Amino acid sequence: SAIMGPNMADQATGVFWGAFTLFACTTASIMSGAVIERIRMASFVILAVILGSVVWNLAASWGWHPAGWLVTEYGYHDAVASGVVHTISGFFALGVLINLGPRIGKFNADGSANVIRGHSLPMTITGLMLIVVGFFGFIGACVLYNYGVNGGWTNIYGGPTTLSAYCFNTLMAIAGGIIGCYACTRDPFWMMSGALCGVISAAAGLDLWYPPLAFAIAFAGGY
């Protein structure tokens, strides 16, 4: 294929391949948080292949491409895959959990729920920092150079944007999510999840939001 050969005019194909492979793996990673230690490895691999190779690809073709029908018909805008990665993965995991049921020990015989807390705050913070670093790579892959009719730096749809907008709004979203979750729970473990909620809540429009708006959206998501 000519696509595999050297082509100095093609600035996007290799980026798309790497980014879409990363995002397919990310869908399985998101699902793993719901089923880890609860299903067999073979079962997880099967679910990961279905989610990353079929379900997510359909969502990406519909809403994460300039010619996708959600984009052309309804103006759907999801610059950093808030919907086509995280929402799709979340609902897929929900479908698995409906059949799997609650974790052992989550509920008592009378129906009351037990709080299953994290076992190590330092490990949780370390994990959050690694995820934040990964988010910058994830988000940076959504900014393309010389792609589409506008040229220069563009989003996944070919619209003009800047890498600065993505980076700064990502920082604002992380801060907003952490603060919003702390305001609601006063729990350091939940604050770590609040950072993720903040980024995911604001991710769809990181190329559009005014920074305080990105913070406000993330605060609401974390809260």
Predicted segments with their positions:
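Hydrophobic alpha-helical transmembrane bundles of multi-pass membrane proteins
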Residues: 1-223
